[in-house]
Amino acid sequence: MCSGVLLTLILGGCAPTTSVISVTAATTESKAAQDAETFEQQYAKYVSLPLDEISEDDLTPLLTGDLLAESTKEIADTRERGTQVIGKYTYSRFAVTDQGIEASGQAYMVAQACLDVTGSRIHDSSGIDITPDRDPLVSMQLKAVTVDDGSWRISDAVRNDEVKACD
């Protein structure tokens, strides 16, 4: 009878048992869970950055592509206008809703989260609060992709009330 130990399977020439198959399936599920956890950790770091001190150096390990470029430009524009965004965002209900491989071979994940913006304010160059009326909770849809070194970066973060992440 064949042993379930991998070394025995290789040396003994036995066919893999179902326990090897289930280990492979469990490994795949475990990898998917680890990737989802990494995505949430990246998002948690992103939303917890102090808005009045944020820099491109803070964003580069977390974001990629258009989202990184747009965020960097927004920081520069805000500083150029003399406005200051203070405080921090928080989030809840983060959930990965899709995972896969794009046609290019790049791995991706899609998630939704409820972004709480009540901890942030916008001040003009005189220090006057100019925060517009806004929804305190925002349903967000997010996408993360793997970059060249195999790590995950957030590539998209858009408001999407259809995902109902805050309900």
Explain the meaning of each model-derived region.
Residues T24-Y89:
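Core segments of small alpha/beta cavity-forming domains
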Residues C14-T18:
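Bacterial signal peptide processing site
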Residues L9-G13:
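C-terminal motif of bacterial Sec signal peptides marking the signal peptidase cleavage site
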